[in-house]
Regions:
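Glycine-rich, Arg-bearing micro-motifs that act as flexible, cationic patches
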Residues: 134-152, 173, 265-287
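Short, flexible loop segments at boundaries between secondary-structure elements
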Residues: 161, 286-296
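Small/aliphatic-rich secondary-structure junction motif
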Residues: 2-78, 156-159, 170-240
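A short acidic, glycine-rich active-site loop
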Residues: 76-92
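Structural beta-alpha unit
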Residues: 1-17, 60, 93-132, 231-262, ...
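Hydrophobic alpha-helical segments and helix pairs
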Residues: 105-166
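Redox-cofactor binding/interface segments in oxidoreductases and associated redox assembly factors
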Residues: 27, 133-135, 178, 264
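Structural alpha-helical scaffold elements that stabilize or flank donor/cofactor-binding regions
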Residues: 18, 125-126, 153, 169, ...
Length: 296
């Protein structure tokens, strides 16, 4: 491993005097217990960017117990009424949390939306936001999850997606780790993260297996991206590793760096979803213990 501060291979780029902002942040919630934390996290981002904050509550798949599958007539109506009542109660609690966050952070533009998990409008809502925040999936496959929503948004929305960890804690994004391999996806992720990078105190660029990818990285891997990031005002360091499991190295380095956010491109060996979410992307998608911004 080697480490260096932002190299100076060329004239440094002058630091920008004004910070770029996100215009609209959209956060998805459902009936999971970490809704308060993900709403808080989105609220912090909205406050710092002066952004409009939209919360979309995705109504969960009704959980049907074995006895309920045999319900008929009055019994089935009672089951439906009970589930509707539970859903209304959950949504009311989430909305109260959302409205409290909007008030505490002085967010002047906000909106609450409620959609069925199967509605085609769920994904459409994400297409026009500057940043989308959603809980990352768990291997447990909870029935309350909109099926494959997080993966689908990363794959096809064309928007930067922050995957918030289950049971995560909301905090301001001040330390950012970038998984950098100089691919189109990584370039897109860094560009999408500029409003966050511009507010960071420290940024680290992690490059793995750079010797095999010199054609993409140039003479000194990480030098040019570090120079451009330094212009945003943050302290930038570059870490170079000759080899290793990229996904696990990203996650372990995020812990070592005390990162508040990991930024990376989502990529794979095929456009098929099963293969796209293999390798590095799949490791991070299901195992990250910190928020991860993915772009593709």
């Amino acid at each position: 491993m080697s480490q260096c501060t932002a190299p100076n291979l060329a004239e440094p780029i002058p630091r920008t005097s004004s910070k770029p902002e996100l215009g609209e942040i959209l956060v998805f919630t459902d009936n999971r217990s970490e809704a308060a934390s993900i709403l808080e996290f989105a609220g912090l981002l909205a406050e710092e960017n002066g952004a409009r904050l939209i919360s979309v509550f995705t109504q969960p798949v009704p959980a049907v117990t074995p006895p309920q599958t045999f319900a008929r007539g009055t019994s089935i109506r009672k089951v439906i009424e009970e589930q509707d009542s539970q859903l209304e109660s959950i949504e009311a609690r989430h909305r109260a949390v959302f409205e409290d966050i909007v008030r505490r952070y002085g967010i002047s533009r906000s909106e609450w939306r409620s959609l069925s998990h199967w509605s085609s409008e769920v994904a459409v809502n994400a297409y026009y936001a500057d940043l989308v925040v959603i809980s990352r999936p768990e291997r447990t496959g909870q029935m309350s999850d909109p099926p494959g929503l997080a993966e689908s948004l990363v794959l096809s929305s064309g928007r930067p997606i922050i995957l918030f960890p289950p049971r995560g804690t909301a905090s301001r994004v001040r330390r950012i780790l970038i998984g950098w391999n100089a691919t189109r996806e990584a370039i897109r992720a860094v560009a999408d993260a500029v409003p966050l990078l511009a507010r960071a105190d420290a940024v680290e660029v992690l490059i793995v297996d750079y010797q095999r990818q010199r054609a993409r990285h140039g003479q000194e891997p990480g030098a040019e991206i570090a120079r451009r990031l330094a212009a945003l005002g943050a302290q930038v360091e570059v870490q170079r590793l000759s080899s290793g499991d990229v996904g696990h190295l990203l996650l372990s380095q995020a812990v070592a760096f005390r990162a508040d956010l990991l930024v990376m491109g989502a990529y794979g060996h095929s456009t098929l979803r099963e293969r796209l979410f293999g390798g590095v992307t799949r490791t991070v998608l299901y195992q990250a213990g910190l928020p991860v911004l993915m772009s593709r």
